[in-house]
Swiss-Prot record:
PANTHER family reported for this sequence: IMPORTIN-7, 8, 11, IMPORTIN-9
Classification lineage: Eukaryota, Fungi, Dikarya, Ascomycota, Taphrinomycotina
Source organism (scientific name): Schizosaccharomyces pombe (strain 972 / ATCC 24843) (Fission yeast)
Function: Required for nuclear protein import and mediates docking of import substrate to distinct nucleoporins. Serves a receptor for nuclear localization signals. Mediates the nuclear import of TATA-binding protein (TBP) and of histones H2A and H2B.
Protein name per its UniProtKB record: Importin subunit beta-5
Keyword Transcription annotated: no
Gene responsible for this protein: kap114
Length: 993
């Protein structure tokens, strides 16, 4: 009955009527409550029903698995988990389908369902799945092999832990090797072999994770498998792809894909285990370079000069991305000293230019289809060609990467040669303009990638360009490249300035095509920002006037370029631009208003606006121009526009004098208050409001606190805003500057009682806060106040009740303080926080013994667990008194400060035969966000000039422990022996001195 209902609903799901589909989907979800729903779906999939119906059953089975099979799935929903009998039936049926099906679509769906279940059930509940899948890999059926690779890809990428991996890996590597080593009967099977190489690469990536914890296992595994794999890779590279006429052989796409996957694997091996690649790298580079040479003619013929519309493949459907990978491998391999010697003769003082350089320039030529795109879409041209940060995911970019590697790692005169070739070939009518453009592009890109400044051999190129421009015979993209070249090297030679008027003429020429005009605009932007000889200041108004005419016609990348150019022109002389305020400021406001949702454009305009204000000779005059417009924007309903207005107001304050003009605060504070009321759910606007308040405090605290607005003081306005921020149910980031603002207020509040209410709001917020940075900022406020007046603050905290049950502010504060101590950073902050903790410990209150906080972790495992597993098995802690916890934290900090710095020697995997590659934050396990967080100055703008900020914390703690143990403060001498051994020893040593 249930099965027939499921079949009917699956049929309706495929109905053309959307209402029928929705009702059927709801019906299927309702049936998920039946314990055997998954079994029924697999039965339908294995039946003789139509393929669409069976496919639909497998799709719903996949959905059911992630929602109901196991709590380990992130998308798991409450509901009945199928019992073991149902699970066993589903697993067995799916494995049978994996072996018996011959329909590609169904096999893909089955393989995905198998991989999902295997992710959570292997090996404990489903040990037979991997042997079965490995057996499939040894079959001759392409669908079966595809299915096997699908499952293995998922297992290796998602679920294998180290114990399982080192059991499976040797067998997997052996079977994969045999599969890839064999000579397949057709090209489609070779495509599957390429997939197998990708799987092998995933195994290498997984091994790298374990090379610290399982170093010996990793060493043995690599030493056993790599030699035969490397030998096999060499043989695969030796296969010929083209015939004697340089025509790509039919049915060779699979071979090419294999070569591309091998290149990617070798690049990954260089990244993970460079010493393992060293013995083979020269052989591989010779083989790969031979392939690159042989593919040049087909690439030029079928991509660069072809009318074909497919820009992702060439030849016999060769994926271009694999040609990119072959080039990138050579680029990486050039870090090897042995590879460098392949191309450079050490016996010749100045080595001759090898033929590889002109070859690589040919690979940088623009394909015909790309030229057509660029000539019709200026934004696409700007996005891809105006930045010299070449995209290495294209053949053009990958070839530049190899040229740059030659420049960086060899003594070959790459830049000199490229420039000499350019000067010669630009005037040679027999050289195709596409090659001329490629040479100039290579000159700029290789220079941009180089860390060294090289300004020679440019003048002859400029002379050649001048001749071509005078003849007016350059095609559109070549003329554009002329201007880009001139602009790029304007910081290297004064000769570039001779072209300024020519470029301006093209910019104002209404008949000139967009591509050339925006290339001219980019050149002007470079002249203004980095030019060795910048345009004379008298030209600034004219440049800005010309650029302003493009405001209405620019969009997308062209608009970004326009804003960058305007910004650069303004910064020629910000003070002079300020004098043009009646024209420049409205232009900036118009651009920001029409592009309010573009953060990059808004950011540039905000910076430019701030620079103008900062340089203005008359700040009050600038306020008269800008404030009315800003307040008009702030009163709009659109939060995006309000955001822009608030940001610009913050810029205006930041660039202003100290103190601010009279009446300034009274003019801007009401709109800021209004923002916090009307847009109370907009985190970003609330943050901007706090930035404005903080800016006003930094610039003119007296005016802010004394200003009377509708019967309330500025001080009361701020307190009310802070109360609103702390009391509302929002993300902690909405209050991110409350702490720094409070510190400023604390320094100016006439009596402590003025802040008691807001401090209690802070403590209530701490009880539910989650973000460590916000928590630290508030704890820091209390730490500063305790250090300033420990007795008064402790009486306030211990006597203030937060609820009818008698919960004190002290209890909540110390619970959060102790639980989050591990997150506190920045030496000055930790110093103040630790000093405050010593004063709390010294306070005579029974709460130090009665208040309980988290102690040590009780239940934990050394095994890495997922977030889902941690939800199922939450960590448990012991509990200790807050007094003992303070002592424990302070002793840990003291021991940490006392230790000598240990510099760990990082292993380079014996890679001495390789030049160092670029080091990124990711090398140290840091994301870009981590780096940004670490680079922030904690609570910048807050006055940290007190003596406590400069305290030698190690010495301070030493004296504290010495005096505390002498007087046995809070039974410290007894508590010491409950501390970890290292802390115990340190404190006992202090006592004995």
């Amino acid at each position: 009955m249930v099965e027939s209902k499921i079949i009917k609903l699956l049929e309706q799901v495929q109905s053309a009527d959307p209402n029928s589909r929705i009702q059927a989907e709801l019906g299927l979800r309702d049936l998920e409550k039946y314990h055997d729903f998954a079994a029924k779906l697999t039965d339908i999939a294995s039946s003789g029903a139509s393929v669409p119906l069976r496919q639909g059953s497998l799709i719903y089975l996949q959905r059911y698995i992630v929602h109901h099979w196991s709590p380990l799935f992130e998308q798991f929903q409450d509901g009945p988990i199928p019992d073991e009998n149902v699970k066993k039936h589903v697993r067995e049926t799916l494995l049978h389908l994996l072996v018996s099906l011959d329909n590609f679509t169904l096999i893909k769906a089955v393989a995905y369902a198998v991989s999902l279940i295997a992710n959570v059930d292997y090996p404990d509940e489903w040990p037979e799945v991997v042997p079965a899948v490995l057996h499939l890999l040894q079959s001759t059926n392409e669908n079966s092999i595809n299915a096997s690779l699908d499952v293995l890809d998922e297992l290796v990428d998602e679920s294998l832990v180290e114990e399982q991996f080192f059991i499976i890996a040797p067998q997997l590597a052996s079977i994969l090797y045999q599969f890839i080593f064999s000579a397949p009967p057709n090209d489609s099977m070779r495509m599957l072999q390429a997939r197998g190489i990708k799987l092998f690469r995933s195994c290498l990536e997984l091994i790298e994770i374990y090379k610290e914890t399982k170093a010996e296992h990793v060493r043995v595994f690599l030493e056993q498998i790599l030699p035969p794999w490397m030998d096999m890779f060499s043989h695969k590279f030796e296969v010929s792809l083209v015939d004697d006429r340089q025509v790509i052989l039919p049915d060779s796409c699979g071979y090419f894909c294999i070569m591309g996957e091998i290149a990617m694997t070798l690049t990954k091996l260089r990244e993970l285990f460079p010493s393992k690649l060293t013995p083979y790298v020269v052989t591989f580079v010779e083989l790969v370079w031979n392939i690159i040479e042989k593919l040049l003619d087909p690439y030029i013929r079928e991509v660069v000069f072809s009318d074909g519309l497919d820009d992702s493949a060439f030849g016999d459907k060769y994926p271009i991305r694999y040609l990119v990978e072959l080039l990138l491998f050579v680029s990486v391999a050039l870090q090897s000293k042995f590879v460098q010697n392949l191309f450079v003769s050490n016996t010749v003082p100045v080595p001759p230019l090898p033929p590889c350089i002109p070859l690589l320039v040919q690979y940088t030529q623009l394909p015909k289809h790309q030229i057509e795109v660029y000539e019709s879409d200026v934004s696409e041209y700007i996005a891809n060609e105006f930045s010299m940060d070449f995209a290495s995911d294209t053949v053009r970019g990958a070839a530049i990467s190899v040229l740059s590697a030659f420049e960086e790692h060899t003594t070959l005169p790459i830049q000199q040669s490229l420039r000499e070739m350019s000067a010669t070939y630009i005037l040679n009518n027999e050289i195709n303009w596409i090659y001329q453009e490629a040479l100039l592009y290579a000159c700029c890109s290789v220079d941009a990638a180089s860390d060294d400044t090289y300004d020679d051999y440019l003048d002859p190129i400029y002379e050649a360009i001048k001749v071509r421009i005078d003849y007016s015979d350059a095609p559109i993209l070549l003329l554009s490249r002329f201007f880009l070249f001139i602009g790029y090297f304007s910081e290297s030679t004064v000769v570039a300035s001779q072209f300024f008027q020519i470029i301006m003429n093209n910019l104002v020429n209404a008949l000139q095509v967009d591509t050339v005009q925006y290339a001219a605009m980019k050149a002007i932007e470079r002249f203004c920002s980095v030019g060795k000889v910048k345009p004379i200041l008298s030209l600034q108004p004219m440049i800005l006037e010309v650029l302003s005419q493009y405001a209405s016609k620019s969009s997308d990348e062209a608009l970004v370029l326009l804003v960058e150019a305007i910004s650069s022109a303004v910064k020629l002389d910000c003070a002079k631009a300020a004098e043009l305020g009646n024209s420049v400021i409205p232009l900036l406001f118009n651009l920001v208003a029409t592009n309010a949702s573009d953060p990059y454009i808004c950011g540039i305009i905000e910076d430019t606006f701030e620079d103008i204000i900062h340089a203005a000779n008359n700040y009050e005059s600038m306020c008269e121009i800008t404030l009315p417009e800003l307040l008009q924007v702030l009163n709009q309903e659109d939060p995006i526009m309000v955001n822009i207005g608030a940001t610009l107001l913050s810029c205006l304050i930041r660039a202003g004098p100290s103190p601010l003009p009279n009446g300034f605060v009274g003019y801007v504070l009401p709109p800021v208050y209004k923002i916090t009321q009307i847009h109370s759910g907009d985190t970003e606007l609330l943050q901007l409001s706090q930035e404005i308040l903080k800016g006003l405090l930094e610039k003119d605290t007296p005016q802010l606190l004394e200003t009377e607005i509708s019967g309330s003081s500025g001080f009361q306005y701020i307190l009310f805003i802070l109360h609103q921020l702390l009391d509302k149910e929002s993300d902690d980031s909405a209050c991110f500057l409350v702490g720094p603002i409070l510190l400023e207020l604390a320094d100016h509040a006439s009596q402590m009682v003025d802040l008691q209410s807001i401090l209690l709001s802070c403590i209530k917020r701490l009880a539910i806060a989650e973000q460590p940075r916000f928590i630290q900022s508030i704890i820091y406020v209390f730490a500063k106040l305790i250090v300033k007046d420990s007795l008064g603050m402790m009486h306030f905290l211990t006597s203030s009740l937060l609820n009818e049950q008698g919960l004190t502010a002290f209890e909540v504060l110390m619970t959060v303080w102790c639980d989050n101590f591990v997150y506190f950073s920045n030496f000055k902050n930790i110093s103040i926080i630790c000093i405050a903790m010593t004063k709390i410990y010294s306070f005579d209150s029974p709460l130090l013994d009665s208040v309980q906080v988290k102690g040590e972790l009780i239940s934990h495992s050394n095994r890495i667990i997922t977030r889902s597993q941690s939800k199922l098995h939450p960590e448990e802690y012991s509990y200790v008194s807050v007094g003992e916890k303070i002592l424990r934290l302070l002793s840990e900090e003291f021991v940490s400060l006392s230790k000598d710095a240990i510099v760990e020697e990082v292993s380079d995997d014996g890679a001495d035969d390789w030049d160092d590659g670029p080091i990124s934050a990711e090398t140290f396990g840091l994301s870009a966000n981590d780096v940004n967080e670490l680079s922030k100055d904690e609570f910048s703008g807050v006055d940290n000039s007190e003596d406590e900020d400069n305290t030698d914390l190690q010495f301070y703690l030493l004296e504290f422990f010495k005096e505390a143990m002498k007087s046995n403060l809070h039974n410290i001498n007894e508590v010491v022996f409950r501390l970890p051994q290292e802390e115990q020893d340190a404190l006992v040593q202090i006592k004995e001195k």
